[in-house]
């Protein structure tokens, strides 16, 4: 005691003994009467008998009691339940229906059912510790005199059989339920035993006006819930490319995989009927940054221990791989996160989102601002001579960025902010301590109401940031020398409903550049803390124009810079032409070109400067997606003004050819043939080819250790279509030296 009072440090012998053995198990004991149910796979046994003071079987006391002989879930694809609930495409052994809409079950008794004296209930249970008050235990009664939150009625009665209609509430928990049929007698309650064949899935229902995800547009609904084939847009603003993707929300096991992901997230069962909470949790669980979620992000170019993001063709392998291994899947970039999330919502309704029934679509934002600290400025630092200072330039502009939109009402926001919501699973910044983003109302983003949850300010900056060029003096002070208001958020694309074409939805995110509405929106965003660049540096009287080019991988080419003098006096520009190999995120991998021409331009004239680019200068450092970024900056000697221009050039990859035998018919074998020729003088090592087709072919892959320069390969695969309609067979080729080679063949399958 004296030592402690004097501030001395106790000796080691005075310290308490170190704990030994395993740490105590963390439980809810002491703060909750029972643990919160957070697993759809957990189940509490429901007693077969609940006897009222009797200890003998009911049959010995009352031989005429009503007994259940059989329960038919009417779950075949051609039967009424799956047809009316739009779930016929799901490959599942169980009944799958949607909430807020009636489905039917047929019950056979040992004698005719008598509504006057027989009391029955169909019971639904989800998760452990089922509770009526929490909506995880729901009894459904056949008479109007007694109803619960789910409605029930007798549709038909014939002999000993009764067809009962059951309507789940439009806000019930979404997931896998267990079903029982219970009969009440004067002596107690007897119910059916647990039978897995009577389990059923209940999904969100965009066809029901009472459901929070109701979408009152049949074409949009068909595209965003039922369509398996997606198109993801990438490339650059003036050179848009397409990537096909199989969402696979109906494939066997995908729905269970999505439910497992929610279980892995420990999401309370009672929250799984709220699309706001489901999508927010999903955006966190799709990445593995802080919760061992589905996908590991990798932008390094080294994919040694996994699959390159450009190699995936669909969501099925990813979701099933995660569910079976219980480990994050390697690797992903933004479009993979968006595509797999889109499956969840269509599944969860595609957990990947379509699978669960939530209308969802993948959206691409061209020139997407990142790392801007929550303000509305993307800063590019130049030295006094107008040359870019890469050591001090921290912000980046992605050539494109993919996210998701999910359709739902937003009762937590003022009227008018429901509808499409941005949800982004790519791990960029934390939100409430986790890597997730959204749901953020698209309408709130367009109108600058970025105070509303969730993460609207971050998305607003992605589409509205100004690109500000600063000139840094030797003393460290910086002056804005040019502000570009229109570069970021140049175009926002998604797939046109039920067509294989693109749809420009930029006007859903922002008002026209320079309009009165746009100025009002930016002022509103400033009120909520988004800082803008207020200065308006004078516009230089010399313009720079960079060309739009189509260049194949491995080509030599000329890069042309046009200087336009719009003044009545001669101008001289000391220019810097810098070419870099960049990731699609705008991050520089290496610099392959540096030229410093001095250009003299006569009054009201233009002059072109040609720069030779040899393939050997960029090929050795090329990264996936083969992007070259050209930045031209300079200083006008006569005025001291700074001129700038930027251009991203995506090199064209060689083609891979896909041919499919035809005509195709359901359940008749077909053949797909892949052909590829290595156009280079060097060999391609470690080549993977992947192939799949929605409704016709499950994912397949083939490995080639080497394809020598100038040689060709042919791969033939047989498959049997399971569904009629128009679809595609998609193929990707991937190796360390060549990424993002793809091809596809459209086919129509007859019934």
What are these regions (language model features)?
Residues 115-117, 569-573, 681-686:
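Short acidic/proline- and small/hydrophobic-mixed sequence motifs that coincide with surface turns
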Residues 208-357, 361:
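Secondary-structure boundary elements
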Residues 590-620, 698-722:
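Intrinsically disordered, low-complexity Pro/Gly/Ser/Thr-rich segments with frequent PxxP/GP/PP motifs
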């Amino acid at each position: 005691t004296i030592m402690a009072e004097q501030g001395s440090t106790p000796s080691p012998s005075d310290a308490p003994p170190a704990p030994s053995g395993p740490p105590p198990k963390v439980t809810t004991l002491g703060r909750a009467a029972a643990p919160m149910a957070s697993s759809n796979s957990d189940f509490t046994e429901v007693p077969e008998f609940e006897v009222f003071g009797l200890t003998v079987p009911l049959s010995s006391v009352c031989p005429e009691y009503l007994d259940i002989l059989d329960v038919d879930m009417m779950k075949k694809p051609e039967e009424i339940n799956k047809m009316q609930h739009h779930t016929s495409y799901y490959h599942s052994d169980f009944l799958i229906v949607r909430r807020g809409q009636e489905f039917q079950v047929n019950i056979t008794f040992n004698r005719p059912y008598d509504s006057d004296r027989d009391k029955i209930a169909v019971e639904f249970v989800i998760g452990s510790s089922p509770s009526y008050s929490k909506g995880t235990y729901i009894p459904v009664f056949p008479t109007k005199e007694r109803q619960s939150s789910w409605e029930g009625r007798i549709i038909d009665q014939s002999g000993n059989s009764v067809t009962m209609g059951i309507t789940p509430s439009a806000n019930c928990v979404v997931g896998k339920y267990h079903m029982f049929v219970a009969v009440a007698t004067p002596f107690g309650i007897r119910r059916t035993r647990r039978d897995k064949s009577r389990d059923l899935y209940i999904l969100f229902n965009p066809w029901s006006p009472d459901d929070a995800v109701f979408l009152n547009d049949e074409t949009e609904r068909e595209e965003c819930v039922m369509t398996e084939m997606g198109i993801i847009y990438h490339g650059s603003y003036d050179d848009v490319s397409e990537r096909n993707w199989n969402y696979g929300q109906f494939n066997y096991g995908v729905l269970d995989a999505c439910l497992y992901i929610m279980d892995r997230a420990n999401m309370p069962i009672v929250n799984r009927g709220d699309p706001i909470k489901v999508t927010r949790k999903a955006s966190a669980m799709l990445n593995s940054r802080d919760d061992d979620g589905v996908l590991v992000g990798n932008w390094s170019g080294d994919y040694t221990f996994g699959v390159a993001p450009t190699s995936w063709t669909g969501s099925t392998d990813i979701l099933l791989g995660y569910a079976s291994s219980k480990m994050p899947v390697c690797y992903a970039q933004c479009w993979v996160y968006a595509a797999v999330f889109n499956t969840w919502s269509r599944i969860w309704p595609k957990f990947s989102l379509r699978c669960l029934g939530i209308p969802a679509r993948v959206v691409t934002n061209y020139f997407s601002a990142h790392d801007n600290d929550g303000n509305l400025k993307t800063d590019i630092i130049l030295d006094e001579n107008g040359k870019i200072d890469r050591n001090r330039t921290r912000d980046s502009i992605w050539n494109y960025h993919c996210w998701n939109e999910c359709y739902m009402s937003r009762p937590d926001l003022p009227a008018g902010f429901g509808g499409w919501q941005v949800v982004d699973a790519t791990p960029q910044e934390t939100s409430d301590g986790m890597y997730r983003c959204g749901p953020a109302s698209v309408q709130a983003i367009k109108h600058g109401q970025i105070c509303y949850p969730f993460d609207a300010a971050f998305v607003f900056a992605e589409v509205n940031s100004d690109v500000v060029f600063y000139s840094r003096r030797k003393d460290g002070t910086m002056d804005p020398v040019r502000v570009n208001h229109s570069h970021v958020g140049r175009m926002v694309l998604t797939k046109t409903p039920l067509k294989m074409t693109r749809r420009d939805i930029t006007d859903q995110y922002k008002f026209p550049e320079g309009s009165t509405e746009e100025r009002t929106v930016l002022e509103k965003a400033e009120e909520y803390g988004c800082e803008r660049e207020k200065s308006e540096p004078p516009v230089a009287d010399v313009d720079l124009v960079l060309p739009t080019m189509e260049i194949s991988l491995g080509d030599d080419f000329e890069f042309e810079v046009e200087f336009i003098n719009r003044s009545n006096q001669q101008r001289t520009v000391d220019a810097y032409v810098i070419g870099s190999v960049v990731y699609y995120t705008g991050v520089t991998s290496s610099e392959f070109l540096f030229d410093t021409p001095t250009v003299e331009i006569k009054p009201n004239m233009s002059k072109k400067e040609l720069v030779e680019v040899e393939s050997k200068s960029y090929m050795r450092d090329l990264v996936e997606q083969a992007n070259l970024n050209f930045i031209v900056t300079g200083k006008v000697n006569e005025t001291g003004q700074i001129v700038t221009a930027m251009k991203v050039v995506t090199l064209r990859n060689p083609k891979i050819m896909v041919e499919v035998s035809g005509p195709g018919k359901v359940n008749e074998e077909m053949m797909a043939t892949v052909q590829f020729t290595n156009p280079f003088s060097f060999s391609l090592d470690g080549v993977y080819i992947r192939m799949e087709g929605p409704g016709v072919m499950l994912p397949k892959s083939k490995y080639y250790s080497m394809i020598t320069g100038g040689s060709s390969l042919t791969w033939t695969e047989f498959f049997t279509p399971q569904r009629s309609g128009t679809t595609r067979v998609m193929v990707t080729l991937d190796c360390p030296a060549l990424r993002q080679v793809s091809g596809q063949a459209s086919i129509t399958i007859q019934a």
